[in-house]
């Protein structure tokens, strides 16, 4: 029986505990804070004992063992085990707010629990530097504006994607909510006609037929779709040959409700027959974002 491994890493306070809970609900045997140097030995030991699906969380608490991780991953690949690598991130400002609101100590902190902002920012930036190489090898999810249910949904979508084949992730967003840091390519479509100014279309989204019909009739919309499509078609094969597991393409309009959503749906529909494809609409759900206490419960 083949073994499925999901390796969750990322910044402290970014939501690794939420991700592990989602994987546990999906039937994974979960282990938090495994020393990186024990990864291949642990996988070999656990093979067939608990489950054929294992999720492991690693972060800066195991900073001393991180240099061993590339070798451990290569050893797993030689054994025919290719893990999903997922890196959870958030902006420094978001992480500072989460730690400050919960009054928890950052794992790299040498000071008191309620350390000053300057010291906390320094700890976060040190952690970001420590994990930089690992981030480059992983699929990145920016949790800065996500609710816990959104993050859980993203994780479950990722584990359903085939390992060893590049997956395209198309995501819409609104520039007024900030630029998503987990994107490989970002396209700005704010110059296109905006359905927001049509009263009957304002409450709808780019997934609704009246909005789609409106946009298909507007000058420049189809040209934008074809330009993005042509760019990706020109380079996707080369990206895949470079052993990329995921490519995240973000399309942004002002609010992330109409134009970007429509184009994401159109592009995903076009590429889905050839590539595993995921869709995300970051700005559509305006409900509260992840609570700091939920995010930090097991991250520090």
From Swiss-Prot:
Alphabetized UniProt keyword annotations: ATP-binding, GTP-binding, Nucleotide-binding
List of residues binding GTP: 59-62
Coiled coil residues, start to end: none
Keyword presence, Nucleotide-binding: yes
GO MF, one example: GTP binding
InterPro entries per UniProt: P-loop_NTPase, RapZ-like, RapZ-like_N, RapZ_C
Membrane keyword on record: no
Residues the entry annotates as binding ATP: 10-17
Protein's job: Displays ATPase and GTPase activities.
HAMAP family noted in UniProt: RapZ_like
Record-stated family: Belongs to the RapZ-like family.
Protein's name according to its UniProt entry: Nucleotide-binding protein Daci_5422
């Amino acid at each position: 029986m083949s073994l499925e491994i999901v390796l969750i890493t990322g910044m402290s306070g970014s939501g690794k505990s939420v991700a592990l809970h989602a994987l546990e609900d999906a039937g994974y045997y979960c282990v938090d804070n495994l020393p990186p140097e024990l990864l291949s030995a642990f996988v070999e030991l656990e093979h067939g004992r608990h489950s054929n699906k294992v999720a492991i969380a690693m972060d800066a608490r195991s900073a001393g063992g991180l240099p061993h991780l590339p070798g451990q991953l290569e050893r797993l690949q030689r054994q025919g085990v290719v893990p999903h690598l997922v890196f959870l991130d958030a902006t420094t400002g978001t992480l500072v707010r989460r730690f400050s609101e919960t009054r928890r100590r950052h794992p790299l902190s040498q000071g008191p629990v309620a350390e000053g902002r300057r010291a906390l920012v320094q700890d976060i930036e040190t952690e970001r530097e420590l994990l930089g190489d690992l981030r480059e090898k992983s699929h990145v999810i920016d949790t800065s504006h996500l609710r816990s249910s959104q993050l859980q949904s993203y994780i479950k979508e990722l584990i359903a994607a085939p390992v060893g084949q590049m997956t395209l992730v198309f995501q819409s967003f609104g520039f007024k909510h900030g630029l998503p840091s987990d994107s490989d390519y970002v396209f700005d479509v704010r110059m296109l006609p905006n359905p927001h100014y049509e009263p009957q279309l304002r409450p709808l989204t780019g997934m609704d037929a009246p909005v789609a019909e409106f946009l298909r009739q507007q000058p420049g919309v189809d040209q934008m779709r074809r330009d993005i499509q042509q760019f990706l078609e020109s380079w996707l094969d080369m990206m895949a040959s470079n052993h990329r597991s995921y490519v995240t393409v973000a399309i942004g309009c002002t609010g992330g409700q109409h134009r970007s959503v429509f184009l994401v749906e159109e592009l995903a529909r076009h590429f889905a027959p050839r590539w595993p494809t995921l869709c995300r609409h970051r700005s559509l759900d305006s409900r509260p974002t992840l609570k700091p206490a939920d995010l930090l419960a097991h991250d520090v």
